Every structure is written in structure tokens, then in C-alpha cells.
Amino acid sequence: MTQRHDEADAVTQRYARRAAADGRYSLLRPEVWQTVQERQRAMLGLFVKHGLADLASLRLLEVGCGSGGNLLELLRLGFRPEHLAGAELLPERLAAARATLPAATVLHGGDATALALEAQSQDIVFVSTVFSSLLDDAFQQRLAEAMWRWVRPGGGVLWYDFTIDNPANRDVRGVPLARMRQLFPQGHVDARRITLAPPIARRVARLHPSLYTLFNTVPALRTHVLAWIAKPDLPR
């Protein structure tokens, strides 16, 4: 119990140190909106590939929903507000999400590993750049197990995170594909590498926005993985 709270407290401190750099993630920056649009296209491609066509009928929980930006995207894509939910550790981000999202969207505060959510109640559990902020392996595993428990058979975990360490930021660490598979050993993984390395993206987009697309054609320069981790359906 103490270890769980220690890591949750550490995450809070890491995000507080990161707040000063938030301007780098403004959608007014060309590399940022291109990163977001690329991820959206890849996500929609995964939905189509895996038969998730009726978005309005799907129940989705985002772990680490922040200020609600991803949930707003999902609403625009066709998810219904009453079928969306978010969990957020940081009170100020949770308050911002509550002020932004429809009242029908349920939001949970606090440590997600302690969330009292019904097993197999979600079609999708979405997690975006969360595990890279968790530096305790045991805490990572507990969260992954909770997420897997919430997903119904035939559903899955939608995962987006970076895979390599950032030497300039010791508050995060990359989550390689092998580690992701280790966290969800029963999952069937469909992964694709996306997102031009942010330091490169910032430099080239400053010269011209179109250079993001050009440099992103080189797979070795992509630092993130978007994956659908399918939970096997029950035999019929």
C-alpha cells in the first residue's frame, strides 16, 4: 500500500516539474498539430481494422485523462459522452477536465490502481503517455493488471507512448514494445510506430511545417508506438 502511494506521490511531483514546459505542447505549434493529427489517423485506422465501427456504442475509459483533451477528440469522432469516462491523478487536471467535458462523462480522481470499476465493463481502456511517467516496475504492473481486468473479452487496450529514453528528462523513461507485451502477456498486439521524435520535429517544423512529414517518412526517427492490445474473446 505504501509503495503504491509513494509512486503516485512521485508522479505528482514529476508532473509539477514538467508544467513549465507545457508551452511546447500547444496546438498552435506546427509540429504539435501534425503529431496529433498523425495519431488520430493511425487510431482511426486501428478502429477500422479491428471492427470497431460503431463508436457510439463503445464504452471507453481513459487512464490519465489529464485536462480532457483526448476525451474531447473521441467525442468529435462519434463516441457518446455517457459511454466515456476518465481517471486522473492530479486534482487540478481533473478539475479542468470536469469544466470542459459534458456532465454525462464520468470522471474519477486519485490513483487509478485503486479505482473501484466493474470488471469487464469497458470495450476500450485508453492510455496515452502514462506508463513512461511511471518509474516503478511493480506499479506499472499493477496498473496494467487493473486495466486488463476492466476490459471485456473482445475489447482491448489502446496504447500510445514513447519507446526510448529521453536523456534530458529523468522523470520519464521509454517503454519498449517488449515491455508493453510483458505488461499485457495475454494480449494480441497490433502496433505501429508513429510520431517524429519531438526534438527533431521542433527543429524542422521551425523551418517549414511540411518538413515534419518529410522527416517522418524515416521509420528510425519515430519515437512512439500506437497499439491495439486485444483481449481474446470468450469461446462460443
Question: Where is each model-derived feature located?
Answer:
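Class I SAM-dependent methyltransferase SAM/SAH-binding core
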Residues: 61, 67-114
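Short alpha-helix
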Residues: 171-187, 191-192
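Conserved class I S-adenosyl-L-methionine
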Residues: 2-54
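A short glycine-rich, Lys/Arg-flanked "PGG" loop and its adjoining helix->strand segment in the class I
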Residues: 141-153
